[in-house]
Swiss-Prot record:
Disulfide bonds: none annotated. It comes from the Bacteria. This is UPF0251 protein VVA1436. InterPro entries: UPF0251, WH-like_DNA-bd_sf. It comes from Vibrio vulnificus (strain YJ016). Gene3D superfamilies: Winged helix-like DNA-binding domain superfamily/Winged helix DNA-binding domain. Belongs to the UPF0251 family.
Length: 100
């Protein structure tokens, strides 16, 4: 039985709901969902340029967990860019505290 997941502190939610290749209807493309904690990890590491330890403390998780989250997030974004998939983002109605 896996350990219960810790709640992750999410500092902001996106203004858009998805990103997709230009000129192709979204219903014709495969989708990859980016979770709220993955988006927050990208924001902390790549936008605010925090070190992993600082970002992990901000989210309320261990440095190793943060590393796993950011790795998953970057992989999803790269797949969407390289393979032309739709990247769906968490919507505004989701809780700021996310159980992942």
């Amino acid at each position: 039985m896996p350990r219960p997941k810790k709640p992750r502190t999410i500092g902001c939610m996106p203004k858009a709901s998805c990103f997709k290749p230009n000129g192709i209807p979204a219903h014709n493309l495969p989708c990859i969902a980016l979770e709220a904690d993955e988006l927050e990890a990208l924001r902390l590491a790549d936008v605010l340029q925090l070190h992993q330890l600082e970002a992990a403390q901000s989210m309320g998780v261990s440095r190793q967990t943060f590393g796993n989250i950011i790795k998953r997030a970057r992989n999803k974004v790269a797949l969407c860019l390289v393979e032309g998939k739709v990247l769906t983002l968490p919507n505004q109605s989701q809780d700021k505290e996310k159980e992942a």
